């Protein structure tokens, strides 16, 4: 069964540049956020998935795994040698962008060195449109909680905007700020804080209703 919402209804349900504040998510061994928690954020968001499906269509049955396999392979090829980590759990993919590529301390401006890898990622997202894309921003423990939450949201929004400007459909994208709540390294060291200043991109397949 195809998704039944019209494009106009989709626009009403989801205005492209949606932002989400800090929530609890799972993590991979490498530190990228994925797993049971992301089901609530992405795969379990029926209204959002219906809105995206109305625009790009949905996947059915065995096609889901094959589609994500091909997308994962392309992403690994595109990001080889960049330091971007690609993780896979079930039918979801997570990209973790290293701190050296992404943002300086206290900044939400994308570093110039990040443009090339981000362009490669955006080209793959355009080639494989039947996924919801959550852009998740993180901060180190420098500063207070409220400041870091705001900073992480602005970082996620910066990447979201860049992807939209690169041609990724805005209806697919959502920016999420996690503040300092999901560290992958020790915040007591300079190297650890640098590692915690990062952005992750989470991909969840859009599945047809009843599939």
Regions found by a protein language model. Name each.
Residues 70, 81, 88-92, 96-98, ...:
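Extracytoplasmic
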Residues 85-87, 92-102, 132-136, 162, ...:
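Soluble periplasmic/extracytoplasmic beta-strand elements of cell-envelope proteins
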Residues 18-74:
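Short, low-complexity, glycine-enriched hydrophobic/amphipathic alpha-helices that associate
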Residues 1-10:
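Sec-dependent signal peptide recognition
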Residues 78, 102, 106-137, 164, ...:
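Periplasmic peptidoglycan-binding/anchoring modules of Gram-negative envelope and division proteins
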Residues 34, 71, 75, 114-117, ...:
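Stable alpha-helical elements in mature extracytoplasmic
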Residues 13-16:
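C-terminal motif of bacterial Sec signal peptides marking the signal peptidase cleavage site
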Residues 138-208:
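Periplasmic OmpA-like peptidoglycan-binding domain that tethers envelope proteins to the cell wall
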């Amino acid at each position: 069964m195809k998704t039944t919402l019209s494009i106009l209804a989709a626009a009403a349900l989801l205005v492209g540049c949606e932002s989400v504040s800090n929530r609890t998510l799972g993590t991979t061994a490498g530190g990228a956020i994925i797993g049971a928690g992301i089901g609530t954020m992405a795969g379990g968001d029926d209204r959002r998935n219906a809105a995206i499906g109305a625009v790009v269509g949905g996947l059915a049955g065995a096609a889901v795994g094959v589609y994500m396999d091909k997308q994962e392979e392309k992403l690994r090829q595109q990001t080889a040698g960049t330091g971007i980590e690609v993780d896979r759990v079930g039918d979801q993919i997570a990209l973790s962008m290293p701190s050296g590529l992404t943002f300086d301390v206290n900044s939400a401006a994308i570093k110039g060195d990040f443009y090339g890898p981000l362009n490669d990622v955006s080209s793959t997202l355009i080639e494989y449109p039947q996924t919801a894309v959550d852009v998740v921003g993180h901060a180190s423990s420098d500063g207070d909680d409220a400041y870091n939450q705001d900073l992480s949201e602005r970082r996620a929004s910066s990447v979201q905007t860049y992807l939209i400007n690169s041609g990724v459909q805005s209806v697919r994208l959502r920016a999420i700020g996690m503040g300092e709540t999901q560290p992958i390294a020790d915040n007591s060291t300079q190297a650890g804080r640098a590692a915690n200043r990062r952005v992750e991109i989470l991909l969840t397949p859009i599945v047809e209703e009843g599939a």
